[in-house]
Amino acid sequence: MAQKLITKDDLKAYLDADAKRFGRKITFKDMLLGNDDWHYFWYFRHLRLLEYHLNNKHRVRAIFWTIVHKIECNRLHLNTYPNTIGPGIRFYHIGNFSAIYQNAEVGANCTFLSGSVIGNKGLKLDSNCKTIIGDNCYFGLNCFVGGNIRVGNNVTIGTNAVVTHDIPDNAIVGGIPARIIKIKETLE
């Protein structure tokens, strides 16, 4: 699960893991062409800087990066809270609103398609109500994962699925409400 970024080494490890998920170096040419990868690369770079400064109580820098983060959230139609996402995150497709709310914990190397919503947003949330996502998960278009649930490692959640109960490791789920379609075979 996501750990807090405290040291410069933690920050560098998260930034390297996020950059590695793009599979190539993000260049100035990507910015000129308006490539989605360029926007997401810088969004997550700024999110990691915000997390680092919040966790180390650098007030002025944290305020600056919070403002930058909010501007980018509105521009990309993407809402993520600091300290909720593990290293190696990957979003695809700018446009449809995606969100990872503050009561969620997302593991490492997760992939989200457009319209994914993780966690709950509400005024009367129980502090013990957490949506916990394992490592190496894949979320299809417009899926919702929320409630006091745990999603295991290596899970694939299909398009338009609504997940409201625990999902074991290596599962493929889909439907409304989501049900297990298949358990992936593991190579050992």
Q: What residue spans do the PLM features occupy?
A:
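Long hydrophobic alpha-helical segments typical of transmembrane helices together
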Residues: I180, E185-E188
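Terminal amphipathic alpha-helical/low-complexity segments used for targeting or macromolecular assembly
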Residues: M1-L76, L187-E188
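Left-handed beta-helix
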Residues: P82, G86-H93, S98-Q102, G107-A108, ...
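Short gly/ser/thr-rich secondary-structure transition/capping motifs
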Residues: I67-R75, Y92-I94, I118-L123
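Short coil/turn segments at secondary-structure boundaries
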Residues: L76-H77, Y101
